[in-house]
Amino acid sequence: NIVAHSRQVCLVSLLIVEHLKPDGLDRDLIRAAALLHDITKTRSFQTLEDHAETGAQLLLEIGYPEVGRIVGQHVRLDRYFASAVPTEAEVVNYADKRVLHDRIVPLGERMGYILEKYGREPDRKRAILLLWEKTEALEARLFAGLPFAPDDISRLLAEGHPGELPEPDPRL
């Protein structure tokens, strides 16, 4: 369920940004991008398009270029560690890597799923493994500034979280 997945990605993103609090990180922008990061995912099942690219393009076309810029990087960042402090795109990218369907999982479990689903060809497998090295480095970067460990995310969210999400539309 893409809606449940996106809500979980949003909660993980908000938990991280709540504790990072670097100057310049826009919480509302992170919330919007996390909720919309898979906006064209369903369509991509039929078209085989890159849903990060098509989602970014759609959001640009309807007047949300900043959200689209982040959505376009939720699978693969344009630049890793582009600034001294984490960016909105890095937060959403990482949060997406921690959510498998609607469950928060360790990076290793998510990588295993992605390799199984998308890494059957040797070139794709190599690209995924390289991407995962960058994701592990991103995790270390983010959590160097956080008062909790990656394995604490599920527990912290279960205990309650300061982020607010709208109730899901039952029609979705």
Language model: regions and residue ranges:
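A positional/architectural concept
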Residues: 2-15, 19-20
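General structural feature for long, well-ordered alpha-helical segments within catalytic domains
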Residues: 5, 51, 67, 131-134, ...
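Solvent-exposed, flexible loop/coil residues
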Residues: 6-7, 103, 111, 115, ...
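Charged catalytic carboxylate motif
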Residues: 8, 12, 54, 90, ...
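Divalent metal-dependent catalytic cores for phosphoryl transfer on phosphate-bearing substrates
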Residues: 17-121
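Charged phosphate-binding loop/patch that engages nucleotide di/tri-phosphates or the phosphate backbone
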Residues: 124-172
